[in-house]
């Protein structure tokens, strides 16, 4: 299109300018209306790029800037498959081949004008000699444009063989000698399973596992100073002789910003320097253990997660269903393996934090055996005789109600030292975490008054599965749910300030998997099941003074009608 080449890759749209070699990315944040693009086609006379989404939504991108959404086909009440396979152009019309017919769009009016139901999977279509031809899985059909093509009787089968037709309208000749890679400044994959800030550098891994592996390519990305970078992937499997995928988390060395460790869902941990792989720790060269030590595939079940440094620069980690579920790589290179009987059978250990007291907390997300583990090692890592530790699988709330079958997905400590955990039963609050080892310890389910003169209240986000919680500079809670978008909750949990969903905002998906907040700017990075989006919040970390560089007036990229 002019000097620009529009590229569809992995469901995302880019424009590459051949003159200045710049790359522009298009997204739901601006200007697109949806995510997961499956097909694009361009009509030059009306300067319209037709954008088809996997959910059958349709956009028209006109003059490279203006977007017109045509959602009627996506919203149409029909039992047939709505998949769109192909587009062709004739005069002011675009004909879209679908899994059950042909959809006609008027580009001049920018509206859907007709739908011709053929009750067949139309692979491609074209107009010739005043006939609309449809190549289907049952042969080639044709309809005269001057007739009523809404009536299926006006479509005639003209051939059983569609191969020549499909070859003519699907094959694209290739010209050129040397291919050129075009790499946009963007994430290498839409897998923001884990996110965390190390200073002002955003660290992201692709994940992950639940009960089983997700089989995602080993993905580690960083975002800093508006630049995306990726860690080495190629060659790691060849060096370790094992698969390299499902990276659960990453941690940056507090003493060396170029030094990182990453944990996997089955192969132990990987060490990187300047983004390059330098070492691998497995059951064969470290005390890390397998969940199935006696099986032939034992070295693919070294399930490590929760990498975190303590204040002394020792690297802690947790592993699933092992005799020594807590391991520490000391700053001098020695290993310490810790045995706590109550977590030997704990599954899906995930997120970890060190609280203000220096206690270690670790979440376990398997409903049948999940819970929250806390360890006070009293400053003596190798000596467990003075340790306090407890694994709670059934919490009691402030009313004495027992919360069973609890899966704990995430954890965060707020500015007041209160600990918030996200569970399959909603958020739970530990107002007095120092009493966690007491037999009478209880959690709090926040009660939000209905304010309808009934005197009744509801538990905050009760029975919502909470995948992520992050605390912003104003001590507010950003809470990401598994299927209902993201909430911004007041510091005390009593007020919902915002509730963003894919329906009322540029949020890519209602399935939130991770949240991280930039410590200086307050920008909220939200990992979803369809990729990453950010929101410029109005709360930043406290600074010593107000100055132009750290204060922004009402920063809000979300349009006013979304609030």
Mark where each language-model region is.
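Conserved beta-propeller blade signature
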Residues: 4-7, 48-51, 93-96, 131-134, ...
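Residue-level detector of Asp-centered blade-edge/turn motifs that repeat once per structural unit
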Residues: 2, 42-46, 89-91, 127-129, ...
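Signature of short aromatic-glycine-proline-rich micro-motifs recurring in repeat-based ectodomains
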Residues: 36-39, 83-85, 184-194, 243-250, ...
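Surface-exposed loop and turn segments in beta-propeller and other repeat-based domains
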Residues: 27-33, 71-79, 155-186, 229-243, ...
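Short loop/turn segments immediately following beta-strands, especially the blade-tip
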Residues: 64-67, 145-150, 226-228, 274-279, ...
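Blade-level signature of beta-propeller repeat domains, shared across WD40, Kelch, NHL, RCC1
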Residues: 426, 511-546
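Surface-exposed, proline-anchored Ser/Thr-rich loop/turn motifs
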Residues: 254, 544-563
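Short glycine/acidic-enriched loop and turn motifs that connect beta-strands
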Residues: 14, 56-58, 101-103, 139-141, ...
């Amino acid at each position: 299109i002019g000097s620009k080449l529009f590229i569809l890759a992995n469901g995302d749209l880019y424009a590459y300018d051949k003159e200045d070699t710049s790359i522009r990315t298009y997204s739901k944040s601006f200007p697109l209306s949806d995510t997961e693009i499956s097909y694009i086609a361009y009509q030059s006379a009306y300067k319209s790029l037709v954008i088809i989404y996997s959910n059958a939504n349709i956009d028209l991108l006109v003059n490279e800037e203006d977007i017109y959404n045509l959602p009627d086909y996506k919203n149409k009440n029909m039992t047939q498959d709505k998949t769109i396979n192909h587009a062709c152009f004739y005069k002011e019309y675009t004909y879209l081949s679908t899994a059950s017919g042909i959809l006609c769009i008027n580009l001049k009016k920018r509206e859907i004008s007709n739908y011709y139901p053929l009750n067949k999977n139309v692979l491609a279509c074209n107009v010739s000699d005043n006939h609309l031809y449809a190549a289907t899985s049952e042969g080639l059909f044709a309809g005269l444009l001057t007739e009523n093509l809404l009536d299926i009787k006006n479509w005639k089968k003209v051939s059983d063989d569609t191969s020549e037709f499909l070859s003519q309208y699907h094959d694209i000749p290739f010209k050129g000698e040397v291919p050129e890679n075009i790499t946009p400044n963007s994430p290498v994959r839409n897998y923001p399973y884990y996110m965390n800030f190390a200073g002002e550098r955003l660290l992201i891994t692709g994940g992950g596992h639940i009960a089983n592996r997700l089989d995602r390519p080993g993905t580690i990305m960083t975002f800093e100073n508006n630049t995306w970078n990726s860690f080495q992937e190629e060659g790691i499997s060849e060096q370790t002789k094992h698969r390299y995928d499902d990276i659960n988390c990453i941690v940056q060395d507090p003493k060396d910003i170029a030094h990182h460790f990453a944990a996997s869902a089955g192969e132990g941990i990987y060490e990187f320097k300047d983004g390059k792989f330098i070492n691998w720790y497995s059951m064969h060269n470290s005390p890390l253990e397998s969940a199935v030590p006696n099986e032939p595939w034992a070295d693919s079940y070294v399930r490590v997660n929760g990498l975190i440094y303590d204040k002394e620069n020792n690297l802690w980690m947790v592993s699933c269903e092992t005799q020594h579920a807590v391991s520490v790589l000391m700053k001098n290179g020695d290993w310490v393996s810790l045995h706590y009987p109550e977590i030997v059978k704990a599954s899906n250990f995930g997120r970890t934090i060190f609280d203000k007291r220096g206690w270690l907390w670790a979440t376990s997300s398997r409903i049948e055996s999940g819970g929250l583990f806390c360890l006070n090692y009293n400053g003596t890592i190798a000596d467990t005789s003075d340790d306090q530790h407890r694994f709670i699988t059934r919490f009691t709330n402030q009313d004495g109600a027992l919360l069973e079958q609890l899966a704990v997905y995430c954890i965060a400590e707020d500015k007041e030292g209160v600990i918030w955990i996200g569970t399959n039963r909603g958020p739970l609050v530990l107002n007095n975490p120092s009493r966690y080892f007491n037999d009478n310890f209880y959690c709090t389910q926040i009660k939000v008054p209905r304010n309808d003169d009934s005197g009744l209240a509801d538990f905050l986000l009760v029975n919502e599965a909470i995948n992520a919680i992050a605390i912003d500079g104003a001590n507010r809670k950003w809470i990401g749910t598994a299927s209902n978008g993201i909430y911004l909750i007041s510091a005390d949990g009593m007020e919902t300030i915002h509730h963003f969903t894919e329906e009322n905002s540029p949020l890519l998906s209602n399935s939130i998997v991770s949240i991280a907040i930039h410590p200086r700017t307050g920008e909220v990075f939200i990992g979803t099941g369809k990729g990453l989006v950010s929101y410029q919040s109005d709360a930043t970390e406290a600074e010593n003074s107000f100055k132009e560089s750290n204060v922004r007036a009402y920063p809000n990229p979300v349009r006013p009608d979304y609030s």
